[in-house]
């Protein structure tokens, strides 16, 4: 089910107000309805289908297991961007775009690892450090968290960018273009629409309008998560917040996904291993492809492996206290329960054992 909104919502949010006519970008001419009191008025008849297309792109990306990066560093967008990304289990940059955040991911990953190390040191009580050293570490953590906190669990470059204000976020858009990453953006009358995959002509300054865009994109991402879980055969109706998506009628879909995700050598041990959660020093046979779990990238796989988790049957056996402990140990901020890893793992296990 597509995310619904109306033209009236856009009107009430002020999405149709562009900039003063002398501040326009001529490339936005096709999207301008007219001029009133020297202010360009955006043609919402074009905005509505364009926004629908962007929402569908976000939903499809997440349903395939992709990652969406919300980008909005201007003051009036920062809070809405962060809230929407967190609510939809996605990622965000709302402070300052660092050069190379996409094109030099290896260096950015090093900074993220430094953030994790500093965080662990401080949470461990910073034993052996002087008061001055603890203060310096605290300041370093705050600086790194502000710059990288929204992408520290992303695990790799995103599959789609959602951008507020293409003028301010030109560097992010250029990096995405270099890597072939599609961009969905709110494009005002003073912006250049070139290079934007999903152009949404609308006001990018009004706080109420920005909040509406972010809410719609977040809802589209959440819908995509539900669709992705449905395609895996997960019982979304048993979740704390079930979605309205229907499970696929063809059980072969689940079987084919599970056969790729679980090594055949593990199936014989499933009955013995799923009664209780256990952490292993090494995988039993070939490790499972944990990246098939929602929101799991290579870095999260490494963290899980370091914690002794290699197989779906381990995660499938987790009870509430096991989830809480592992989540706290790995600082996952509730991701295991939120993204439904246990339910997904059980679906893989059951399909492989059938």
UniProtKB/Swiss-Prot annotation:
<dbReference type="GO" id="GO:0006412">
    <property type="term" value="P:translation"/>
</dbReference>
<dbReference type="GO" id="GO:0003735">
    <property type="term" value="F:structural constituent of ribosome"/>
</dbReference>
<dbReference type="GO" id="GO:0022627">
    <property type="term" value="C:cytosolic small ribosomal subunit"/>
</dbReference>
<dbReference type="InterPro" id="IPR005706">
    <property type="entry name" value="Ribosomal_uS2_bac/mit/plastid"/>
</dbReference>
<dbReference type="Pfam" id="PF00318">
    <property type="entry name" value="Ribosomal_S2"/>
</dbReference>
<dbReference type="InterPro" id="IPR023591">
    <property type="entry name" value="Ribosomal_uS2_flav_dom_sf"/>
</dbReference>
<keyword id="KW-0687">Ribonucleoprotein</keyword>
<dbReference type="InterPro" id="IPR001865">
    <property type="entry name" value="Ribosomal_uS2"/>
</dbReference>
<keyword id="KW-0689">Ribosomal protein</keyword>
<comment type="similarity">
    <text>Belongs to the universal ribosomal protein uS2 family.</text>
</comment>
<protein>
    <recommendedName>
        <fullName>Small ribosomal subunit protein uS2</fullName>
    </recommendedName>
</protein>
<dbReference type="InterPro" id="IPR018130">
    <property type="entry name" value="Ribosomal_uS2_CS"/>
</dbReference>
